[in-house]
Regions:
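A short beta-strand-turn-helix
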Residues: 60-77, 102
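Short leucine-rich amphipathic alpha-helices used at interfaces
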Residues: 18, 31, 39-44, 59, ...
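Ser/Thr/Pro/Gly-rich low-complexity linker/stalk segments immediately outside membranes or between
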Residues: 37-55
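Flexible, active-site-adjacent loop/turn segments at secondary-structure boundaries
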Residues: 61, 67-68, 115, 149, ...
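A generic local structural motif
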Residues: 64-67, 96-97, 196-197
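Short, flexible loop segments at the rims of nucleotide/cofactor-binding pockets, characterized by
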Residues: 57-58, 88, 187-188
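Structural alpha/beta surface segment adjacent to cysteine/selenocysteine redox centers
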Residues: 75, 80-85, 91-170, 200-205, ...
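C-terminal cap of thioredoxin/glutaredoxin-like
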Residues: 2-36, 166-275
Length: 275
């Protein structure tokens, strides 16, 4: 993957090299083709008359005690990851985000919220409930262990055998019988639905979709970088595609749409942290 280089007329602003932009756009484009337009019956279309509507990032709630949090709640950046456990692009981005977050210590935290795409992955909602049962039986550490293991073993695209769910529970050290009882109860269906409805209200139409909650307003340089990079990527995407990167009006929320590559995600974080 190519690294960043400065534009000659504006030496303090960094932009992606064309090859890197093309790779980013290709990944994003595949994710959009895969997901967008599959949830029309559950909310407004994200594309209308060839013009994408702006995300309503203010609809993404602040982190609370019920969230699945990896890191510190008051971190300068909290990544809210809306994800489908059978989505192949979610599997890619989950690994990418984990790698990026690990390099920032207490500056970046991660929150996971469910967004199963039933029309594409009929198993994803049940798997989301399984992850919630892991949380009930073992707390936050077991939730993340279960989630990480599920992403590691699933072939994606509805390919995971449901018989693997209790095996994953056993693998991460959960009591198999209690897990099976929890999962069969369906007690977490409402929790999954609430995450999904929040995502829809914020403009999520496909997965993966991440919203960065910032403790402080993004700097002018960071906003310029995000806006310019989005414009470059947009040139490689079909007209009317939702924005790949977007900064909310208050400058304290940023969305990332699609399975963006490690280099681009890290550059966004570096800009937001003034590194």
């Amino acid at each position: 993957m190519n690294v960043m280089e400065p534009i000659s007329e504006k030496p303090k602003r960094d932009f992606l090299l064309p090859a890197s932009i093309l790779i980013s756009a290709l990944i994003v484009s595949l994710a959009l083709v895969y997901n967008v337009g599959k949830r029309a019956e559950k909310g407004p279309e994200s594309v209308s008359a060839g013009v994408a509507s702006a995300p309503a990032l203010e609809k993404v709630r602040a982190v609370n005690q019920d969230d699945h949090l990896r890191g510190k709640k008051d971190a300068p950046i909290v990544v809210v990851e809306f994800s489908d456990l059978e989505c192949p692009y979610c599997k890619i981005l989950h690994k990418t985000i984990q790698e990026v977050v690990a390099g920032y210590g207490d500056d970046v935290a991660l929150v996971f919220r469910h967004f199963p795409l039933d029309e594409l992955h009929s198993k994803a909602r049940h798997e989301a409930e399984a992850a919630e049962c892991a949380n009930e039986l073992g707390g936050s550490d077991k939730f993340w262990a279960y989630l990480d293991r599920l992403f590691a073993v699933t072939p994606s695209n509805n390919g995971l055998d449901p018989a693997e769910l209790p095996r994953i529970a056993e693998y991460v050290g959960l009591p198999k019988g209690n897990f099976a009882s929890c999962l069969s109860s369906g007690k977490y269906a409402a929790r999954i639905q609430a995450d999904e409805e929040e995502g829809m209200a914020a403009g999520v139409r496909g997965t993966p979709y991440s919203v960065l909650l910032l403790r402080n307003e993004a700097s002018a340089g960071a906003k310029d970088f995000i806006t310019a990079t989005n414009s470059e990527i947009a040139q490689q995407l079909p007209p009317g595609s939702p924005p790949t990167l977007f900064v909310a009006a208050d400058g304290k929320r940023v969305s990332m749409n699609g399975a963006l590559p490690y280099e681009l995600v890290k550059q966004v974080f570096d800009k937001l942290l003034n590194r």
